[in-house]
């Protein structure tokens, strides 16, 4: 009987600690800032949209994102890709490598470490992970050539500001540079997505559902 009485308090103590850890974990996630790039699905990014977004609990920012479809080339490799124009001061990212490239007229890209994995040579052979890593390690001197798919003969260079650990699958650059490129090459410049930043996991889930629900 003594053993039972000794085990019971220990068991209850373990349960209490477990529940406390769960509650603390939940609390910490409700204090965390969440961010995700979300398609507008038919919504129009305008003053009315922003006013409604401001009412969402925990909202930190709603940043416009403008995608530009391009063809990228690097050495003997090339691929179709999207460059996402966004206000870089609002973008949360983790950089693996950073160069000292200065923002100017030449587009300066933040490249996710997996965003160029679809690069292929003229025979259709996908670039190896080893070769891609070698190229990305020299991001300071890396130059990509880009063109809009409707005007393949009109190419322009892009420099690299950083290789990102997160977000790993996107190529981002300044929305001001995106606008300048669109105007220079006669491309559409429209907000198709947003960068949604919300405090708290529950608030973020609800805000994401509200914004990403299909609209007609």
Where are these regions (language model features)?
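Membrane-interface junction motifs in transport/secretion proteins
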Residues: 26-49
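Extended, charged/glycine-rich binding lobes that contact polyanionic ligands
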Residues: 64
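Basic-flanked hydrophobic alpha-helices used for secretion and membrane insertion
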Residues: 33, 49, 53-61, 69-76, ...
């Amino acid at each position: 009987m003594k053993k039972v009485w000794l085990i019971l308090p220990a068991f209850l103590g373990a349960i209490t600690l477990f529940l406390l850890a769960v509650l603390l974990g939940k609390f910490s996630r409700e204090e965390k800032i969440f961010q995700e790039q979300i398609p507008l699905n038919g919504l129009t990014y305008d003053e009315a949209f922003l006013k409604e977004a401001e009412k969402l609990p925990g909202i930190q920012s709603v940043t416009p994102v403008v995608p530009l479809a391009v063809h990228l080339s690097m050495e003997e490799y090339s691929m179709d890709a999207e460059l996402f124009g966004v206000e870089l001061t609002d973008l949360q990212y983790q950089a693996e490598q950073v160069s000292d490239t200065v923002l100017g007229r030449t587009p300066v890209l933040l490249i996710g470490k997996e965003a160029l994995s679809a690069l292929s040579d003229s025979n259709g052979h996908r670039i190896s992970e080893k070769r891609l890593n070698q190229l990305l390690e020299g991001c300071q001197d890396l130059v990509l050539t880009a063109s809009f798919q409707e005007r393949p003969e009109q190419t322009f260079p892009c420099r690299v500001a950083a290789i990102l650990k997160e977000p790993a699958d996107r190529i981002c650059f300044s929305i001001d540079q995106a606008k300048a490129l669109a105007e220079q090459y006669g491309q559409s410049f429209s907000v198709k997505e947003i960068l949604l930043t919300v405090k708290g996991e529950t608030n973020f889930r609800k805000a994401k559902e509200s914004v990403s629900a299909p609209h007609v």
